[in-house]
Every structure is written in C-alpha cells, then in structure tokens.
C-alpha cells in the first residue's frame, strides 16, 4: 500500500521521553505517557502513536477511559488494521497450535492469547468444533466485525460463540455481551479430551470460556504425586485435577468448591471416565472455612491441590492478596502429613513467581513446617508469553514437599 492510498489515522502524541517502552515493543501506552491526541478518535478506533517530535512508533487502538490509553496492534507502519491483518495473525497463531495439538493429541486449546499473539484484548479458545471468543478491550470490540470475518475465513466449519461477559469490559466503557455469533449453539456440556481424560465443558455458563485450558500440564503433572495418596482438591471447579488424580491412582480425592453446579459436573466427569466414584468426595463449602474446620478436627492429607481464583485485580489489592495467599497456603501446609505434597498456584498477573515463592516460604514458617520446592509450573504452551510482554506470564505454581 502506497503513502497516497494508506488510511490516515488520528495521532496519539507521547510526552518527551515516554517512548522507551514502545521502542522495546511493549504493547501498552499508559495515560501518563500521553501528551495529546491529534484528530478525533472514537472508543477503540485505530490511531497512530508518535513520539513528541512526530516520529512514528506504532499503530494501536484508542481507549480514552482506560489507564491503558492505547494497545498496540502493530509496529509495522506498512500494516493496515483490517480483515487481512486479523487473518494473518490467526494463521500465525494456528501454526503453533497445530504442532501442539498433533504432539499432545489435543482437540481443545487456546488459539489466541491476547498480546502474546499480537491481538491485544482478544482471547479465543477452541473446543473442538466451537470457537469461544472474548473481547476484553475497546480496540478488540471496535474490530469485532473484522475479527469475526477473519475467523470465518480461517475456520469456515466452526461455530463461533461470544463470551465477552467479563467485568473488565466495564473499565473501558463497554457492555457485557454473550451469545452465538455464527453456527449452532454449544450443547449444555461439550465433551473434550485432555491427556487421556474426557471432560465436560460448559461453554455457555462456565467460568471464563468454560474451562481452564492453561492448567492442562499441571493437571497431568499431578498424577506422579498421588498414587495411593489421600488428595484434597481445593477450588476444584469441574474436577479436572480430581479426574487426573484418580487416573494417577489416588486412594481418595476430596473436591471442594462453592458452586454446586461445578461439583455436579465434576461428578459427571469422574463417571464419564469410568473411574471409581467411591474414591471421590464432593464438598460444597468455602475453602478457607473448611480448611480451618479440618484443622480443628485433625484431618490429614497426603497431597493438597490449591488452585484459587485470582485474588488481585490491581496493585492496590496486592498486599491484601499476599495475605490471602499466605493464609490459605499456611492452612494447607498444616493439614499435610510429613512428606506430603502441596501443589499450589496463583493466576494473578501482578503476583510474580518470586513473590509467590516467598509467600509460600512465609506460610511454611507460620505453619511451623519446613518446605522443599521440588517443581515449578506455568501456563500451558498454547498460552505463550511474548518476550516484550512479561505480563503475559500470569499463571505460576509450585510443587512443595512439606516436612
């Protein structure tokens, strides 16, 4: 495309010296870096980002109500943001997922992981025939039609379902949306396969897009720790860890969640895999309260899986989240038999691996126990982390031996 035919975009001018992160190809521009907007841009509209002298830096999406004023689509000045752009991004992402799916025998995976796949604010999970779409930023929402058109080009045989019913959209002035986009409605429970397990996924009503694909490798790793062991599975959701523990030969697995619907699906997942249901117990309760009750009654376990929801949404909540993580891990450590294994996770992006490890160490001190770190976990490989966006590494975990 020549200069004369190239679209003219409004220009976001940065303050002097605030271009360094973009020169390092970080995909966000924060409000404090902005000097002014030249021209008029609607919410989510494409803009050019320039330094204080007018030098072109990137092309992104405008979001005047967010602390992240712009999210970068491209660092290539010759690249226009259109259907062809989204088609290229989808095909680039699919190449890696094709290799993973063939290697690991997957029928479900994360197809687009936001910024790390060059599509900020876009999450797409594939569950067999269904593509589940989440648009989390103003720019992603503005480009909805182009993105869906690209998806139809790349995946003409797939149905698309929208799960953009996420509260974070409100921060950028967007309503929550959910429903079928193209093709048939997903069934109430869709069966998928993962490392030899059959699992039922609730695309329409489940958490996020229906299932936590990012914990796939951690669920598999669980099997090596559980043979003939009594396992406590906290924040169990639909029982992925429970099924994996049973497949690993555990003596008993107790799954705890506040959602009866999730526990009912967990029970169905055990039955679907023809595992011994008598070895599985399902408890609807608050994990914090139940752990304290178990401590008071002298209950003990050999393996505890701790996979809580996100405790921290912003920096102001970090200190409180640290206390929450410490308390819950302290309780878990106190319930473990000597030599027991704690598999503990944090999906909070603001929680670094180093900080999380320190919290576990502090929890062990408060519990009066020694802990050995024996294995480290992160999100599965279909959730890549691009080098210029370390925030993409949000899931971290440890296997700990409690002495």
UniProtKB/Swiss-Prot annotation:
Q: Where in the cell is it found?
A: Cytoplasm
* Main localization of the protein described in the UniProt heading: cytoplasm
Catalyzed reactions: cytidine(1962) in 23S rRNA + S-adenosyl-L-methionine = 5-methylcytidine(1962) in 23S rRNA + S-adenosyl-L-homocysteine + H(+)
User: What EC number(s) does its UniProt record assign?
Assistant: 2.1.1.191
PUA domain spans which residues?
A: 9-88
**Organism's domain of life?**
Bacteria
Q: Which Gene Ontology cellular-component terms appear in the entry?
A: cytoplasm
Q: What class of enzyme is it?
A: transferase
Q: Which InterPro entries does the record cross-reference, listed alphabetically?
A: PUA, PUA-like_sf, PUA_sf, RLMI, RlmI-like_PUA, SAM-dep_methyl-trfase, SAM-dependent_MTases_sf
- Keyword NADP belongs to the record: no
What keywords appear on the UniProt entry? Cytoplasm, Methyltransferase, RNA-binding, rRNA processing, S-adenosyl-L-methionine, Transferase
Q: Tell me the GO molecular function terms.
A: RNA binding; rRNA (cytosine) methyltransferase activity
Name the Pfam families on file.
Methyltrans_SAM (PF10672), PUA_3 (PF17785)
| Functional summary from the UniProt entry | Specifically methylates the cytosine at position 1962 (m5C1962) of 23S rRNA.
What is stated as this protein's family in its record? Answer: Belongs to the methyltransferase superfamily. RlmI family.
Name of the protein in question? Ribosomal RNA large subunit methyltransferase I
Which organism does this sequence originate in? Salmonella paratyphi A (strain AKU_12601)
Q: Which gene encodes it?
A: rlmI
